[in-house]
């Protein structure tokens, strides 16, 4: 007896519906995609009981003709593609011809539409079967009314969450569409009450409108970049904002929300120097890519994408974010918003003050990108730590720890690196502050402008050295004996092979001497004694970007050269560190940790009930 048989057509449709429609928010996503693809400039959304009871969408798009309305709910019917070639350059949100048929199978659906504005037609479908088709009064656009969701899918309906949770999922879908289509007016109604309106606006304003309350001062930086077939727009939070989860890293490709591990890593790597371990950035990435270079047909809900011939994409994202935090913030577009909350914390008023905002650096101190060497009599010299009166204890520490003395000496010597000339003291005055002292042999206490700073001596010295290294002149150094190393992972091997020429630009010469085998032949002079750091980078290349190679190297060198916890510092050297600290634009160590803690006079008075 035969065991394999053809499935009933209706059963096949129910199986297909179960793949793409798993809860009310899936229905909402598909209906919104159709409205957006129709060219609508206004979309009204009505949800009842989290979409479980009812989902109603009204748009002013191009509409559906009488003939198309009769077949639009049938499987594999679509107006968006007609050939295999169209799959290679998808420009619409929908394209499979499965959404309406899947919705019609698992619910009751009514569609009323007009293409002329003079007359409209309505079709009613229950369980995938047409029940009624009739003429209706004229409307402009389309109305889709979905009710009794999963009434014929009892197992699926049992697994739905409570109304507040389903509502939250629907609002998340709405957020994705609202943020990526600022040219559309959206009106949101929950349980027959108007909850929020988004008016047509720029992408900058829309991002501020939707995500502005994520950062306390409501200020985003906008980074724009164009490269060949790619347009990149990134909204970045200030360096001192981070989260304990990845929830506020969002990526959009051609206006689709995408969950892509590589994009997430590129964003995280770009922030690596300003984030401490366990923290994640607040970042919203928008990519516009020629459809011929991407494939969205890889996930049932189109949450993933494949990129073709774009090997540089992730590096481009990471490098630009990394460079953003290295440059003066004046070069970027500042946006300020003012949020006015109603009783239900939903309606938001936007004020874009970008053109009137007086753009200034975060810290009102002069820049200094040159290392101040021992030749300057006003700077600490080789023996500065031993000169402080009364620090006899430290004299013995220096004698017992020659490495510390050597490290401090090397930082200010020409034998360590070739540095630019120090600034003229007549041209650049020291920053005014009151140095109070050192505590726990770890922190420097400083008073400045009615605020007290507790500065991590190791972290700040590490950061100072790191910045000098990045801006120093470097020379190539050929190794007497090349160092051989092996790359076992085939994917990493391909990456290394493709980047050998880029390494040369960094004065790092490696050559392939066999399958999986390489040798390191030349390195920059500052990398002397740090060859193992280079090798480790190559062997873990999969999850890191080239720009992080320089950062990792300099961070390692700076960490080893900097003063350590438990080192007692002279007043002179402490003041030097503090002066340099206030010149730093980004006050994080190269590994992402914060350098300091600050408390104002007012905050301190509040703690002791004086304010």
From Swiss-Prot:
GO terms for molecular function: ATP binding; ATP hydrolysis activity; ATP-dependent DNA damage sensor activity; mismatched DNA binding. InterPro entries: DNA_mismatch_repair_CS, DNA_mismatch_repair_MutL, DNA_mismatch_S5_2-like, HATPase_C_sf, MutL/Mlh/PMS, MutL/Mlh/Pms-like, MutL_C, MutL_C_dimsub. Keywords: DNA damage, DNA repair. GO terms for biological process: mismatch repair. The keyword Chloroplast does not apply. CDD domains: HATPase_MutL-MLH-PMS-like, MutL_Trans. It comes from the Bacteria. One of its GO terms (cellular component) is mismatch repair complex. The keyword DNA damage applies. Belongs to the DNA mismatch repair MutL/HexB family. This protein is involved in the repair of mismatches in DNA. It is required for dam-dependent methyl-directed DNA mismatch repair. May act as a 'molecular matchmaker', a protein that promotes the formation of a stable complex between two or more DNA-binding proteins in an ATP-dependent manner without itself being part of a final effector complex. NCBIfam families: mutl. This is DNA mismatch repair protein MutL. It comes from Borreliella afzelii (strain PKo) (Borrelia afzelii). The gene is mutL.
């Amino acid at each position: 007896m035969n065991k394999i048989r053809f499935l009933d057509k209706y059963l096949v449709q129910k199986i297909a519906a179960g793949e793409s429609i798993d809860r009310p928010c899936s229905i909402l996503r598909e209906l919104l995609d159709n409205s957006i693809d129709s060219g609508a400039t206004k979309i009204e959304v009505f949800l009842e009981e989290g979409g479980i009871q009812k989902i109603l969408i009204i748009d002013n798009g191009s509409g559906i003709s009488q003939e198309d309305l009769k077949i639009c709910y049938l499987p594999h019917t679509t107006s968006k593609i007609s050939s295999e070639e169209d799959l290679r350059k998808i420009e619409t949100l929908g394209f499979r011809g499965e959404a309406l048929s899947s919705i019609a199978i698992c619910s009751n659906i009514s569609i009323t539409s007009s293409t002329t504005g003079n007359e409209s037609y309505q079709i009613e479908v229950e369980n995938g079967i047409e029940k009624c088709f009739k003429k209706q009064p004229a409307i402009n656009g389309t109305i889709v009314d979905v009710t009794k969701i999963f009434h014929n899918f009892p197992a699926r309906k049992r697994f739905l969450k409570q109304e507040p949770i389903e509502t939250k999922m629907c609002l998340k879908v709405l957020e994705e569409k609202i943020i990526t289509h600022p040219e559309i007016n959206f009106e949101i109604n929950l349980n027959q009450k108007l909850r929020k309106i988004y008016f047509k606006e720029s992408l900058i304003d829309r991002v501020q409108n939707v995500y502005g309350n994520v950062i306390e001062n409501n200020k985003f930086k906008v980074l724009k970049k164009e490269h060949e077939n790619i347009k990149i727009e990134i909204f970045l939070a200030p360096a001192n904002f981070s989260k304990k989860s990845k929830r506020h890293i969002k990526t959009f490709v051609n206006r689709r929300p995408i969950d892509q591990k590589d994009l997430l890593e590129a964003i995280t790597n770009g922030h690596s120097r300003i984030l401490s371990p366990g923290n994640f950035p607040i970042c919203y990435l928008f990519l516009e890519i020629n459809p011929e270079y991407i494939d969205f047909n890889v996930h049932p809900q189109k949450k993933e994408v494949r990129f073709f011939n774009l090997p540089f994409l992730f590096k481009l994202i990471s490098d630009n974010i990394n460079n953003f935090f290295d440059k003066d913030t004046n070069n970027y577009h500042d946006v300020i918003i003012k949020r006015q909350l109603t009783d239900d914390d939903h309606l938001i008023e936007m004020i874009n003050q970008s053109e009137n905002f007086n753009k200034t650096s975060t810290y009102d101190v002069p820049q200094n990108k040159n290392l101040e060497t021992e030749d300057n009599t006003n700077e600490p010299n080789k023996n500065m730590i031993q000169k402080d009166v009364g620090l006899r204890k430290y004299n013995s520490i220096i004698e017992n720890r020659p490495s510390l003395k050597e490290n401090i000496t090397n930082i200010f010597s020409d034998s360590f690196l070739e540095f630019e000339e120090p600034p003229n003291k007549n041209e650049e005055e020291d920053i005014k502050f009151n140095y109070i002292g050192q505590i726990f042999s770890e922190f420097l206490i400083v008073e400045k402008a009615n605020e007290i700073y507790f500065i991590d001596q190791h972290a700040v010295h590490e950061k100072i050295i790191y910045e000098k290294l990045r801006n120093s002149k470097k020379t190539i150094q050929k190794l007497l004996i090349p160092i051989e190393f092996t790359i076992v992972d085939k994917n990493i091997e391909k990456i290394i092979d493709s980047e050998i020429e880029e390494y040369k630009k960094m004065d790092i010469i490696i050559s392939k001497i066999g399958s999986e085998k390489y040798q390191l032949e030349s390195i920059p002079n500052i990398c002397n004694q740090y060859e193992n750091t280079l090798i480790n980078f190559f062997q873990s290349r999969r999850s890191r970007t080239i720009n992080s190679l320089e950062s990792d190297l300099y961070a390692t060198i700076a960490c080893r050269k900097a003063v350590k916890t438990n080192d007692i510092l002279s007043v002179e050297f402490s003041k030097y560190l503090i002066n340099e600290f206030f010149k730093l634009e980004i006050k994080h160590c190269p590994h992402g940790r914060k350098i300091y803690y600050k408390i104002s006079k007012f905050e301190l008075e509040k703690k002791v009930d004086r304010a």
